[in-house]
Amino acid sequence: MPRIFNLARRMAGPDAADELTQDVFVRAWQKLALFRGESSFATWLHRLAVNVIIERFRTLGTARERFLADSEAVLEVAHATRTKHLDLNMDLQAAIAQLPHGARTVFVLHDVEGYKHEEIGDILGVSAGTSKSQLHRARQTLRVLLRKEA
């Protein structure tokens, strides 16, 4: 469960992580009969989680901008109250949360979760090249954001 929650937190932010984690386990219960054992259960559950989270962003449609604006407001408040003694992990998490949705999704799937660009492309419905460019953009943005924090 912590792995699914952490994935949801990284991809969608801390406010949505609890609800998305619950949605993943509800969906897993509903789809359990479809588990064929071709991979480990953890791998199947993780892939299901990625799909549920991405589906949530797709169904948000125009509400997605409002969701992202709310996330930005939370980040602004969090940034204003931060002390000088936060560790690099907290700075990195805040920087990841500031990435545009597409770049953040690719970054988390590739660099954090270990997916290959071809797998990411299949999940997101984009080419491997698009995944690579999104990852490059995410890494560049993170460098800039983390330099500002230093």
Give a label for each model feature.
Residues 5-23, 128, 150:
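Short, charged helix-capping/linker segments at alpha-helix termini
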Residues 33-36, 50-68, 85:
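Arg/Lys-rich amphipathic alpha helix in sigma70-family domain 2
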Residues 19-26, 39-51:
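Structural recognition of an alpha-helix C-terminal capping motif at a helix-to-coil junction
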Residues 58, 104, 139-150:
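Short, Lys/Arg-enriched C-terminal cap helix and immediately downstream tail that follows
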Residues 64, 71-97:
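Acidic, proline/glycine-rich intrinsically disordered inter-domain spacer in sigma factors
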Residues 10-14, 23-40, 59-63:
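Sigma70-family region 2
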Residues 116, 125-130:
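Helix-turn-helix DNA-binding motif, specifically the short coil turn and the N-cap/start of the second
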Residues 106-110:
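A short pre-motif secondary-structure segment
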